[in-house]
Amino acid sequence: MLLAPRKTITPAILGVVFGALYAALSLVRFYRFDPSSWDNAIFEQGIMGYAHFGAPIVDLKGPGFNQLGDHFSPIIALVAPFYRVFPSAQTVLMAQAVLIAISVAVIAHVAIRRLGQIRGIAITIAYGLSFGIQSAVQSDFHEVAFAAPLLALAGAAYVDRDWPWVAWWTLPLMFVKEDMGITVAAIGAVLWLAGQRRRGAVLVTIGVVGMALVLFVVIPHFNPAGGWEYATKFGGDRSVLDVALDQPGRKLLTVVLTVGITGFLAMASPWIFLALPILAGRFVADKEYYWGTDWHYSLVLMPIVFIALIDAMNREHKHPWLRAYAAQGAAVALAFAAVMQLQSPLSVLGKPSTYDPNPRAVSAREAISLVPKGASVETDIGLMTHLVTDHKVYWLGTADNPRPDYVLFDTGSGLGSPVDAVAYAQGIHGGIWKLVLAKDGYTLAKSQ
């Protein structure tokens, strides 16, 4: 069915607006040298390898380390053509902003088409401002950014009961990350429940078998240790049950917030079952940062719960009270989103102090400028995102790093980096080193 021009243009406008917000937040953090983790640098090194028609070598994980031995995310190669033309950390950050913005446009498209202009826009705004998306943008690039548009597209096809396209949009998830097979299998189970027995069974089989092959064959093949190093995160040194029962209040809050942003209406759609294995996997992992709502771990849940919301509002419900409540679902979701903005990552864009000059950023740029392009440098999380594009970068926490040309540390951001760069370099790498710069907590030493 053809859409009215306004119903076609509005989703695109919403996608562009939110994409601009995500890009602005990413770039502001980048130019202010606000480190979140080393992940953006890791993915840039991997994408750089693909961009030059080679393997995704990530020296930050170890000299010559193939990223496919860490996480199976070959889909990031799709960023490589853009990176080849615009080689920079900002290109990687913009890729994530664009991918999430596409998911916003997809959510808007199906919501407006199924629920009308006003309710559709309200749901889209709530989705675009959701905590899972904002936390992911704040955490810099991660491969799961590719899952956002794919899950939105598969979900939109589910709302339309377009079963073939549900399957087609689901399959690429296998190339996003090694554990996405469980989500593929969950979508297959939902299709099975919807009466699509053959398609459902195929997706379940592909998800389970494909995930097993990746975890036990592909990743061990590329990993120097011959295994999947994250296997020990489930239970860790404790039993899985002990971990599952740890901090129940925190985990319950994560669940409540995840479905609460839809006014709990998402629970009225079978599509919400996709969230169960994702949350379960996080809650039995012995890493406390998996249990909350920070970082990028809730990004994949956002298109799931909002598609479930749209599907729930689009369904015919037997109970009058549920029909009445579903009619107000968009308003409830928007109200929840408004309350959540008070301390949200995007809120910093409205604060004048965000744009004040950062003296340490000036010193950081000076330190980086003293490292010639193409030189090798051992560094910490505070500066690696800004160094990777033009230098061969190693992380100080990786064993067996070769002797670099420079060591550069950020000792002023509480990362625990060595205060005396010369003493560190001589102790770890030997030889003679000269202090080049010590300013505002940045220390740079050069090999002689």
Residue ranges of each PLM-predicted region?
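Start-transfer (signal-anchor) and selected internal transmembrane alpha helices
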Residues: 1-24
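Transmembrane-helix signature of polytopic, membrane-embedded enzymes
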Residues: 12, 102, 107-129, 148-149, ...
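Aromatic- and kink-enriched transmembrane "portal" helix at the membrane-lumen/periplasm boundary
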Residues: 73-80, 89-106, 124-148, 153, ...
